[in-house]
Amino acid sequence: MRRLASALVFASILLGMKTVHAACVGRPTDAAGFASYDYADAAEVKSFAGTKVRVHYATTGQPAPTLTSTRADGVPDTVAFAADTGDGALSKYEAMGYNAVPSDAACASNGGDGLIDIYLVHFTAADGSTHAECDAGKCSSFALVESTFKGKGYANAEEGFKTVVTHELFHAVQNTYKPADAPFWAEGTAQWAMKKVHPELQDFERQMPAFFADPTRSLDAPPGGVTSGFLYGSSVWPLFLSLRQGDDFIRTVFEGEVDGADPLTSIDKALKAKSTSLADEYPLFAAWNVGTGKLKSSGGYPDAAKYPGQATMSLKDGASDITSGLGYFAYKGTLTAEQGITLETDASRNAGVVVPIVDDVLELDQAKKLPANANGSVLVVVSGITTKKSDAKFTIHVGDPIVETPAPGKDAGTPPVTSTPAPTAPAPDDGGCQASGGPTSSSALSAGVVALGLLFRRRRRS
C-alpha cells in the first residue's frame, strides 16, 4: 500500500496482517462504499476497461479526475493512461514469472467483470492502497488510487499514475503468494518492482532518506505510522538482493512464503541454496549502503551517487556498541601498517566486514569478512545478523596481523572467508537489555584455530 490516510483503511490493513480478508468485501461503487471511500456525491460513475484492468471514476464531485479527453470515445486521457499503465505493469510482472492476479468474477461486487479493478478516489494525505479478497487460499485484489495527484508531490498526473498504479498492482501480485506480508518486504519490493517497470521514475530515490538516516534500526522493525518512509526506503534491500542474486531471486522468496514462512526466513533459505546466507549478505548490504552519496564506491549500487549516503564513526581499537536485530554501525579509519581487525561478540548475533578505500573510492568488490587483515584507509561495518531484538554487544579490536586463509578468485562484492572460528552456541536470549551469556572473542578463537592448523575453505557463490 502507498501512504494511507484513512484510519478505517489502516484498521482494515492491521486486521489483514493477522487474518486473511474474507472474500467480496465491498467496493467504493457500492451504496455503502468501502472504508469511507465512495462516489455518493457523483452525478455519474463510469468505468473504462483495458486488457487486464478496469478503471472506475466519478464524473463530478471530489473523487473526479481531470476529465479532459483527446480521444474519440471521450474517455478522459488520465483514465485511459491509468488503464494502460495497469495493463503494462501486470504484463511486465507476468513476463518476470510472477503469478497472474486471479479474476474477481465470483464476487457479486466485482466491478462488472473479472478484470482487476482500480477505483479513482480522493485521498486526504495518501495516494493509494490495495485490498485482497481471498477465498480458499486464492486471492484477487482491487486498488484505490488518487484521482488527480494534485498536491501529492508528483510533476503531473501521469507521473503519479505510473508510480502508484505500478506499485499498487505489485501488491496485488504479492497477495497471490502471501496476503498481508511483513510491511518492510511488501512495501520494499513494491517500490523495487515499480522501478523495474519504470526506471525513469524517481520515487524510489525520494523514499530513501528515512531508511538511510536510521541504520541502527532493524530492517524488520520500522517506526510507527502508516506512512513510514522507512518502509518505502527499505526497497534497497530487495535491490541489493536482485543485484547480487538476479531479479528472479525476489520471486523465489515469494514462492518460499506460500506456506507461511516470513520473508527473512525465505530469504535465508533461498540464499543458502546459492551457498551463502542472510548472515553472510547482510553486513555487505550495510557496506553497500554506506558506499553511497558523497562516498564514492565501486562494486555496489549502480546509482550509488544518487542515494543519500550514511554517516560513519571513527575506527579505533576498542570501538564498541550494541546492535538490536538487523541494525548496523559503520566506522572509517586509516591503518599505517598491515593490522588485524577482529570482532569480539556473540558470533550468532553479529558479523562484520572490512572494505578498502583506495584513492577515496570504497572498493566493495574487495570486502572481506572479519576477522581480516587490512592496511591504509578502510571502512569497517558491524551488523546484526538475526531478528532477535535483545542487546548484542560487540567490540572491534585492531592489532597485530592475523593468519588468513588465502582467498581464491571471487565474485564481485563477495567477502572472502578468513580464518573465522565456528561460533559457540549462544546463551538463551531472555530479551533483556543485557542478555545473559558473555561474548565470544573471535580474535582469541582465531588464534586457537591457527594453532590447530584448521583453515576453512572459502565459501563460493553460485
Q: Would you name each region that the model predicts?
A:
Residues 1-4, 458-462:
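Positively charged n-region of N-terminal signal peptides that target proteins for export
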Residues 7-16, 449-453:
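Bacterial N-terminal signal peptides
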Residues 17-22:
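Sec/Tat signal peptide C-region and signal peptidase I cleavage site
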Residues 51-182, 189, 199-203:
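Juxtacatalytic substrate-recognition/specificity segment
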Residues 134-136, 159, 163, 178-244, ...:
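Acidic/His/Gly-enriched intrinsically disordered linker/tail segments
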Residues 259-425:
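Beta/coil-rich, acidic/histidine-enriched accessory regions frequently appended to metallopeptidases
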Residues 421-443:
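Extracellular Ser/Thr-rich, low-complexity/disordered mucin-like segments
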Residues 442-460:
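A cross-kingdom C-terminal cell-surface attachment/processing module
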